[in-house]
């Protein structure tokens, strides 16, 4: 509006968006608390914020995020992305955030990709699920090299933060998921689709209710 010569305060715009247009901001639910576990083994940061990969399946990043059903129940998603092209190679959701969820996600990714023994580095934070005996031993058994962010440094795993923000802003925060099956299907299948298919096409096909009455508007290529 400024380019058209109009000047309004943020308060005025907010008032008319609410009263005249019926538009409301989407507020993210409060992040659920988790209990820290005792680490079995902590690894150094081998990536050091170098998120460039020369080829697929060279550097992967992984993390957990929380998602909500309409009734307020929380579910946890574990995802892995390939830094070569930022594609999602695995996404698994469950009721509990555990080392088993992390293992199942990595196992799913490895089964879907052709990985040369000892060629893959998996970067994560220092959450107990990734430092647990079960997970570290699983990584060793499949010849995956672990790398970890320094505690408290979210920028060390920035690609995962960016992916989860996009997932929530363009998908899960816009729709009311009545059942966990609806949530699991969208969160686990949508990221695996070709990039030419937008979220709106897939969500509309499932006839999911839109939150707050608002509408939401493959070849692997390297990301520079």
Predicted segments, located by residue:
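Active-site beta-loop-alpha junctions of metal-dependent nucleic acid enzymes
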Residues: 73, 92-115
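Alpha-helical structural signal in soluble globular domains
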Residues: 16-19, 109, 134, 138-142
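RNase H-like two-metal-ion nuclease catalytic core shared by retroviral integrases
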Residues: 36-38, 124-126, 132-135, 149-168, ...
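C-terminal domain-tail junction helix/linker
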Residues: 140-144, 166-224
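Basic, flexible linker segments flanking DNA-binding modules
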Residues: 1-55, 153, 208-217
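Short small-residue beta-strand/loop micro-motif enriched in glycine and branched aliphatics
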Residues: 85-91, 146-149, 173-174
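An active-site-proximal beta-strand-loop segment
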Residues: 49, 53-89, 95
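Mobile genetic element proteins and their domesticated derivatives, centered on retroelements
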Residues: 13, 47, 63, 80, ...
């Amino acid at each position: 509006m400024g380019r058209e010569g109009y000047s309004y305060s943020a308060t005025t715009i907010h008032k008319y968006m609410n009263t005249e247009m019926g538009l409301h901001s989407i507020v993210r639910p409060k992040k659920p608390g988790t209990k820290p576990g005792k680490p079995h083994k902590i690894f150094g940061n081998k990536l050091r914020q170098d998120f460039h990969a020369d080829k697929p399946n060279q550097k992967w990043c992984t993390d957990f995020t929380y998602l909500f059903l309409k009734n307020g129940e929380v579910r946890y998603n574990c995802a892995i992305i390939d830094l070569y092209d930022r594609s999602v190679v695995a996404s698994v959701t469950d009721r509990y955030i555990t080392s088993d969820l992390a293992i199942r996600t990595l196992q799913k990714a490895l089964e879907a990709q052709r990985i040369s023994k000892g060629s893959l580095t998996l970067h994560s934070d220092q959450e107990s699920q990734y430092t647990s005996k079960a997970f570290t031993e699983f990584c060793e058994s499949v010849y995956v090299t672990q790398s970890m962010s320094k505690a408290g440094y979210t920028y060390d795993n920035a690609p995962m933060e960016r992916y989860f923000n996009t997932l929530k802003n363009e998908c899960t925060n816009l729709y009311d998921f009545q059942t966990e099956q609806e949530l699991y299907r969208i969160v686990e299948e949508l990221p695996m689709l070709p990039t030419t298919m937008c979220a709106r096409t897939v969500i509309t096909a499932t006839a999911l209710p839109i939150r707050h009455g608002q509408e939401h508007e493959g070849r692997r290529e390297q990301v520079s």
